[in-house]
Each structure stands twice: as C-alpha cells, then as structure tokens.
C-alpha cells in the first residue's frame, strides 16, 4: 500500500517538475494581479509578455500523458480484480 502512495506523490512531483522550466522562462511585464487563488498555469500565461501557445501545448501534452498513464494504471488494477474474482 505504501508503494501506491509513493507512486502518487512521485507522479505529482514529476508533473510539477516538468512544468516549472516552462514557467520560469516566460517574461512577465505589466500588471501582475491574478484574480483568484487557484494554482493554474493559464492565468500565468495571460500575464506573460510573449506568445504562450507552444508552452500551452507542452503543458497540455504532458498533462494528457499523465492522465492516460493514470487511466491505464486504474484500468489494469480493475482487470486484475476481475480476473481474481473470476478465478
């Protein structure tokens, strides 16, 4: 059970570590006010003084990869449960 918790924490850590270099390289200028408290990347992209299309694509691609990976782990665990119930 500890490996599941560790895997979840490591997955979240890796997801964040991948997004940090994307945000650090953005040039920010002008008003620096975000009107909510959520830790989202889209409001930061709006504050950037450059075109953030490619950064958005990178973040979307990695988020999609992690979502698909999590879904596959979930489906595989259900398959194991169903196989064990059948036997």
Swiss-Prot record:
InterPro entries: Olfactory_Receptors (IPR050427). Residues 1-8, 77-87 are cytoplasmic. Odorant receptor. It is found in: Cell membrane. Keywords: Cell membrane, G-protein coupled receptor, Membrane, Olfaction, Receptor, Sensory transduction, Transducer, Transmembrane, Transmembrane helix. This is Olfactory receptor-like protein HbT2. Belongs to the G-protein coupled receptor 1 family. Its main location: membrane. Residues 30-55 are extracellular. It is a multi-pass membrane protein. GO terms for cellular component: plasma membrane. Signal peptide: none annotated. The chain crosses the membrane at residues 9-29, 56-76. GO terms for biological process: sensory perception of smell. GO terms for molecular function: G protein-coupled receptor activity.
């Amino acid at each position: 059970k500890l490996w599941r918790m560790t895997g979840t924490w490591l997955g979240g850590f890796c997801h964040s570590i991948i997004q940090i270099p994307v945000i650090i390289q953005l040039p920010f200028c002008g008003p620096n006010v975000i009107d909510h408290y959520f830790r989202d990347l889209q409001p930061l992209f709006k504050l950037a003084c450059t075109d953030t299309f490619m950064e958005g694509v990178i973040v979307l691609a990695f988020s999609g990869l992690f979502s698909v990976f999590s879904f596959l782990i979930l489906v595989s665990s259900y398959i194991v449960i169903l196989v064990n119930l059948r036997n």
